[in-house]
Amino acid sequence: LEQFRITAENMSEDRYAYYISRISEVADKMTPHPTPFEMETAAAFLYFKEEQCDVVLIEVGMGGREDATNIIPKSLVSVITPISMDHMKFLGNTLEEIAYQKSGIIKNNGLVVTAKQENCVMNVIENECCEKNARLIKADNVTEYEISLDGEYQRENAAVAEEVCRHIDGVSENDIKNGLINTVWHGRFEKICDKPEFIIDGAHNIDGVKRLKESIEKYYGNRKIVYITGVFA
């Protein structure tokens, strides 16, 4: 249950069952019945509220504009990570269409931090910010701090995280440095065995695979590599 975490501690199975049961009491009376993701989103909101969390990081399920998580009317900051071709059946067949869905999380008069994007994607984000009078910050460099994660793209991700943290009250530069050097990201270029050396990565779209390829070439370029790929058909 790693999708529900408070201070790096996963929600227990008992707590998960408790909150889903509470949500089900309401959901079972609704037509149409909420999807499992919508129910889990509602359970997460209730869980974080009752645990009195100071700051909550909510990750969109898919897209953004029509996602269940986007029910939040106002946020400290809306974060847009690199946009590439993904979930085309639901989000659109062009980068512009997908960017339109992703930029739907931008709030009126809000703050937006975006990673480096293709020009056509950035244009969509800028237009959305203009329409909603939102302030846009472009984290289009790489972090200068030491990070724990391998891969040059992780330095780009870290730059986004830095900008976000700088706009949250109570987070110092020292906190940011410590956070980056102690970050753990399971399933993203993660070594799970040394003999033989075994790396797992959850890349599931073109951009993710390209980034994985770059990391493999950088760290294992001169070695024989065996690939095992799983695809959900």
Please provide the spans of the model-predicted regions:
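ATP-dependent carboxylate-amine ligase catalytic core
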Residues: L1-P73, L91
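Acidic-glycine-rich active-site phosphate/pyrophosphate-binding loop
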Residues: R15-Y16, A134-E144
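Short catalytic-loop micro-motif centered on adjacent basic/acidic residues
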Residues: P32-T35, V112-T114, I199-I200, V226-I228
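Conserved beta-strand termini and adjacent loop/short-helix elements that scaffold enzyme active sites
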Residues: A115, A139-N141, I192
